[in-house]
């Protein structure tokens, strides 16, 4: 297992950022291109979606000659993250346009539920961050409440990311975000 040994996998002891539910991988690939001093891991639970991300990465490598040595992928369910990362090993977690699981009986499946926040707490380094973007107001409100109830500190909050100059600076848009915003 690579748990606690991701620096060895990358061959460089650098901060580790992960994206949970990376979809087609545009966001995390662009981040890895812009920030070679950070190691990135894209997490996707569906092999078919992960395969599409790998194809896109290959195409970029062929077209641009970029290798993305600071980017890896994991095909796992987010509930299993503590089995793949050591305590304090992850410096940042990105949650971008996650499935809102709109039915109340599915609330525990939301990636911002207390159960998931507890899992993230296990793997986040001291001072580690979770960055969350959604266009679903119900999920947003639910997430704010879960953060509060879990005793987490909310550093920045906006209801309109794309009209906030300060937050948009350096924002990498996901494929979904580009399409629908």
Feature map (PLM): residue ranges:
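A short acidic, Gly/Pro-enriched loop at the edge of an enzyme's catalytic core
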Residues: 83-92, 97
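A short glycine-rich, Lys/Arg-flanked "PGG" loop and its adjoining helix->strand segment in the class I
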Residues: 112-126
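Conserved SAM/SAH-binding beta-strand->alpha-helix loop
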Residues: 46
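S-adenosyl-L-methionine
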Residues: 1-18, 26-33, 57-87
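Conserved glycine-rich SAM-binding loop
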Residues: 23
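Class I S-adenosyl-L-methionine
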Residues: 143-145, 149-181
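Conserved beta-strand signature within the Rossmann-like core of class I S-adenosyl-L-methionine
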Residues: 126-134
């Amino acid at each position: 297992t690579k748990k606690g040994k991701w620096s060895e996998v990358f061959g460089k002891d650098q901060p580790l950022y992960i994206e949970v539910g990376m979809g087609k991988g545009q966001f995390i690939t662009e981040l890895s291109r812009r920030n070679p001093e950070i190691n990135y891991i894209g997490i996707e639970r569906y092999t078919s979606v992960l395969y599409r991300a790998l194809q896109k990465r290959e195409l970029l490598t062929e077209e641009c000659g970029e290798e993305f040595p600071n980017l890896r992928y994991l095909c796992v369910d987010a509930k299993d993250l503590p089995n793949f990362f050591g305590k304090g090993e992850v410096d940042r977690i990105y949650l971008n346009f996650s499935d809102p699981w709109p039915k109340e009986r599915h609330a525990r499946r939301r990636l911002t539920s207390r159960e998931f926040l507890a899992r993230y707490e296990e793997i986040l380094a001291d001072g580690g961050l979770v960055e969350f973007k959604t266009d679903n107001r119900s999920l947003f409100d639910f997430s704010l409440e879960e953060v509060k109830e879990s005793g987490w500190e909310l550093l920045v909050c906006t209801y309109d990311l794309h009209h906030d100059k300060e937050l948009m600076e350096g924002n990498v848009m996901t494929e979904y975000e580009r399409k629908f915003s």
